[in-house]
């Protein structure tokens, strides 16, 4: 199957099955989204949504969090992964926002990447979800599903390479949704250790499943 046809059929499926898709993180502002995304690294959205309400009740914006110390923030995020490092990142990020952007989260990629604790994946989520830009964040779910569905090649062995490969074929209008489509498919169907192939409606297009069946 040609690469273009594979993309067309897979994207058509996702458009039909998930027409109104969005992040599962809960937030009330762009700053709160940024905090939630930073916290979500190596952690589930469910866990993040459990800790952010109390965190945001004390630190609803960059200016209030910038006045805190990492140990203050740590009290509210102890149950997430790497809490000490994340508390440090959050306070430094908030202070940088206040110093450089009057407490507002910028939409520019380079300005986002200059913030403490913000990498390309996080910056892409902010650009896409908060500002509606054509940006595709590649997390572990997106990376795994893209490879299993044959959307990218084995040579695309870094998140950046996967991002570039995906955005080469995905129509610009679909790019923001494509992140959520692939992520949610990876989170609930094409899971890491025991993928639910029996209920996957894309199994006819899955080279990974075909390869596994030949080895059986």
Model-based region annotation:
Residues 2-215:
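Catalytic cores of DNA base-excision repair glycosylases
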């Amino acid at each position: 199957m040609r690469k273009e046809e594979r993309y067309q059929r897979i994207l058509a499926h996702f458009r039909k099955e998930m027409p109104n898709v969005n992040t599962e993180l809960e937030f009330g502002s762009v700053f709160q989204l940024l905090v939630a995304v930073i916290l979500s690294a190596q952690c589930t959205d469910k866990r993040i949504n459990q800790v952010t309400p109390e965190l945001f009740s004390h630190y609803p914006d960059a200016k209030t969090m910038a006045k805190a110390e990492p140990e203050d923030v740590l009290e509210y995020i102890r149950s997430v992964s790497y809490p000490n490092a994340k508390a440090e990142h959050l306070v430094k990020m908030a202070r940088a926002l206040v110093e450089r952007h009057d407490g507002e989260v910028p939409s520019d990629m380079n300005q986002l990447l200059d913030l403490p604790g913000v990498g390309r994946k996080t910056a892409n989520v902010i650009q896409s979800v908060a500002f509606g830009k054509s940006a595709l964040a590649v997390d572990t779910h997106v990376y795994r599903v893209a490879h299993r569905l044959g959307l990218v090649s084995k040579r695309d062995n870094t998140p950046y390479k996967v991002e570039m490969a995906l955005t080469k074929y995905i129509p610009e209008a679909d790019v923001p949704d494509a992140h959520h489509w692939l992520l949610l498919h990876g989170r609930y169907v094409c899971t890491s250790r025991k993928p639910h192939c029996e209920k996957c409606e894309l199994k006819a297009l899955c080279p990974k499943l075909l390869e596994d069946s030949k080895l059986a």
